[in-house]
Amino acid sequence: MNSLLKIFSFRVDLKFRKKRNYFVAKYTICDSINIGDGTKIWSFTHILKGAKIGSLCNIGENVFIENYVLIGDKVTIKNGVQIWDGIHIEDDVFIGPNVTFTNDRYPFSNNRNYKLEETLVKKGASIGANATILPGLEIGYNSLIGAGAVVTKNVPDNSVAVGNPARIIKRADFHSEIN
């Protein structure tokens, strides 16, 4: 009976997946059904059931997205990124390859007093390759985090932060400078 149920649920799953309006590459585990139209999810990526991903996103290879994650529209996540519980990424954000997000400032293997610290990446922010974002922080609107930066404090809107620890080196409205 259990094997028959597994076969039936597999067939239902196949029918459901044919009707989706987003792309999932081979060798990807996508447990979430909360994925927006036009989103592309590439190989060797694992998205857990509770994750919510907006429309027109591009999620690279070898990405892991945990349950309590919110990702807005038009977000690009490059290869090798892990996004843990409590991370909220607003619209139009770029996350470079191998960016590391953390959600527990004091991790232990058997931590019963685990405190999830939420992180917010605001609209239009860009995070360079190999940057590390410590938990409980806010990356400001249209801010830029340089490659390899270790962000230990909040980054204000329209700022450039670089280094270890990351420090603000410039403040500007980047979108108005481009136009």
Regions found by a protein language model. Name each.
Residues 153-154, 165:
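Conserved functional loop/turn residues at catalytic and ligand-binding sites
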Residues 3-15, 19-20, 26, 30-34, ...:
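Flexible, glycine/small-residue-enriched loop-and-beta-strand segment within the central core
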Residues 158-160:
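Extracellular disulfide-bonded cysteine-rich modules/repeats
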Residues 145, 163:
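Conserved G/P- and acidic residue-centered "switch" motifs that form tight phosphate/ATP-binding loops
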Residues 26, 149-150:
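General secondary-structure propensity
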Residues 141-144, 150-152:
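Internal alpha/beta core interface subdomains
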